[in-house]
A protein has these predicted regions:
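Short amphipathic, charge-patterned alpha-helical segments
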Residues: 5-9, 193-195, 345-362
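Histidine-anchored nucleotide/phosphate-binding helix
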Residues: 186-200
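Hydrophobic alpha-helical positions that pack around
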Residues: 88-89, 218-344, 356
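Flexible inter-domain linker/hinge segments
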Residues: 67-135, 288, 292-310
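Accessory "access/gating" subregions that flank catalytic or transport cores
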Residues: 118-159, 315-316, 321, 329, ...
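Conserved phosphate/anionic-ligand binding catalytic regions in large, soluble enzymes, centered on
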Residues: 133-155, 197, 254-266, 272, ...
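Ferredoxin-type iron-sulfur electron-transfer modules in oxidoreductases and energy-metabolism complexes
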Residues: 1-19, 36-65, 116-133, 161-165, ...
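Gly-rich Lys/Arg/Thr-decorated short loops/hinges at beta-loop-alpha junctions or inter-strand turns
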Residues: 100-115, 165-179, 282-288, 329-334
Length: 525
């Protein structure tokens, strides 16, 4: 509609309409951004296209009814730079999302795209590139937080005629859409980073494992790979060197366990997605038995900019042990739902109340779940906790891939733990008994408690079984699956007691614990 309106006013020779990736501010989408003046129009409908073109482009006047309104001051904010949601962020992995047409390689190149690859191939040795990544302090953004440069170094040191580089784009956490947004908004950054990884590790083949439910991300990735080949940035003798590298796409069926690297590799090989015992690690023996380096989308998105700006610049951002930024999918009972990127060390309070705009409808903050089904629920006492890998683990949660769900006073924490166990039981690969059977028993106990049939003894059994699963499950997904139960028991034990002792649910979410009475004064029918 915007293009049609531009053509109706005969402005097509001087005005471009560019479809970009996600701006991140999902609460206010769809969004139209006018450049160069950065006017930011929110919640735009197709019927608004004519007004935008006629008023803004022809008459030079802003369409005031479409401008963002600061809820605190009730004032219009025309420039996105002055909107709290954006001005408190630092975008590195998301640097190009919303700024370029992801289907146009020239726009990526105009923002220093493929410069890092060229520099690596023509000015640096594989060892010096790996050292730069190690010195930057970049850690895996998929949840484990393993040092990225060290993983590359391990893969490089293994002698083998064939090696592989894998991009894990299997994003299975409920409410998480970080990797999808990067692939939809900046696919060339992933192509470039994978080629750099291939150069460093000695791999000539790259594989992107992506769930088939991401059709737009898949389509834009295909376009990026094709364009890179046409420009000689993938294929034989890249940048006139003896380095050759190519990328293929592998599709996942949406199994949560396939986010675990060994299960992912099994799936790519056409086998059932099941985790395997480590060692051997994929870096030593992975896809088709060959050394395989696996990183996730967000990890790769940081690589080109580290080589461009230097390890010292990147390591100056964040905390002592967690460098750089982290992308989060901020969701739940918060005013500003969306995709955000903040420096490591930013507090939960700054994210939820500064960027997120606080709790919806003036309700009271109750908890925030970080790390998805593998994470934990943190309370008001954790709001000033600086976000990094170690702090979240110490608090009983984890970074995970970046899901962050905010809850208010109307949420039941016992029901929330049961919700995540629902997911875990459904998604278990079934290979090991602690996860296959143990989580089912956990879920049954939670079902018993929320149905009003729980006992005090059930609470002790619940905690004991959760601890056994955590200690004995085969893979990281199974080992972390009891976290929602353990963290809610640690932080909201009084709610568990109310469910089993008083048979009440303070949030009024557990229907079996609700009692309905008829008021005869009002029941006159």
């Amino acid at each position: 509609n915007l293009k049609e309106a531009v053509e109706r006013h005969k402005l097509q020779d001087i005005v471009q309409v560019i479809r970009t990736g996600c701006f991140g501010f999902c609460e206010k989408g769809p969004i139209v951004k006018m450049v160069p003046d950065n006017t930011f129009y929110v919640q735009v409908k197709p019927t608004d296209a004519e007004d935008i073109v006629r008023e803004h482009l022809v008459k030079g006047r802003k369409v005031e009814r479409l401008l963002y309104v600061n809820p605190e001051t009730n004032e219009q904010v025309p420039d996105s730079k002055h909107i709290n949601f954006y001005k408190k962020q630092l975008r590195i992995a998301l640097r190009n999302c919303g700024f370029i047409n992801p289907e146009n390689i020239d726009e990526y190149i105009a923002r220093d795209g493929y410069v890092a690859l060229g520099r690596a191939l023509t000015e640096m040795t594989p060892e010096s590139v790996i050292k730069e990544i190690m010195d930057s302090g970049l850690r895996g953004r998929g949840g484990g937080g393993f040092p990225t440069g060290l993983k590359w170094q391990i893969t490089r040191k293994v002698k083998a005629p064939q090696k592989y580089v894998v991009c894990n784009a299997d994003e299975g956490d409920p409410g998480a859409f970080m990797d999808r947004s990067i692939l939809e908004g900046d696919p060339h950054s992933i192509v470039e980073a994978m080629a750099i990884n291939g150069y460093c590790t000695g791999a000539t083949k790259g594989l992107v494992y992506i769930r088939a439910e991401y059709p737009l991300a898949v389509e834009r990735l295909k376009i990026a790979i094709r364009q890179a080949k046409e420009y000689g940035l993938l294929g034989e003798n890249i940048f006139g060197t003896d380095f050759s590298f190519d990328i293929e796409i592998r599709y996942g069926a949406g199994a949560f366990v396939c986010g675990e690297e060994t299960a992912l590799i099994h799936s790519m090989e056409g086998l059932r997605g099941e985790a395997t015992v480590k060692p051997p690690f994929p870096s030593e023996q992975g896809y088709k038995g060959c050394p395989t380096n696996v990183n996730n989308v967000e990890t790769y998105a940081n690589v080109p900019v580290i080589l461009l700006k230097g390890a010292e610049w990147f390591s100056s951002i964040g905390t002592e042990k967690s460098k750089g930024t982290k992308v989060f999918a901020l969701a739940g009972k918060v005013n500003n739902v969306g995709l955000i990127e903040v420096p490591m060390g930013t507090t939960l309070r700054e994210v939820i109340f500064g960027i997120g705009g606080g709790i919806k409808d003036g309700k009271k903050f109750k908890a925030v779940q970080t790390g998805g089904p593998s994470g934990g629920c943190l309370t008001e006492k954790h709001l000033d906790l600086p976000i990094d890998y170690d702090n979240l683990l110490a608090a009983g949660s984890m970074m995970g891939s970046g899901g962050m769900i905010v809850m208010d006073e109307d949420d039941c924490m016992v029901a929330m733990a049961k919700f995540y166990l629902d997911f875990t039981v459904e998604e278990s690969c079934g290979k090991c008994a602690p996860c296959r059977i143990g989580n089912k028993r956990l879920h049954e106990m939670l079902q018993k408690i929320t149905s009003g049939n729980g006992t005090i003894e059930d609470l002790e059994r619940l905690r004991n079984l959760a601890g056994v699963i955590k200690d004995t499950a085969l893979c990281g997904l199974g080992q972390t699956s009891p976290n929602p139960v353990l963290s809610t028991m640690d932080n909201f034990y009084d709610e568990y007691l109310e469910h089993v002792r008083d048979k009440t649910c303070r949030a009024k979410q557990c229907k079996s614990l609700l009692t309905y009475t008829i008021n005869p004064e009002y029941c006159i029918g």
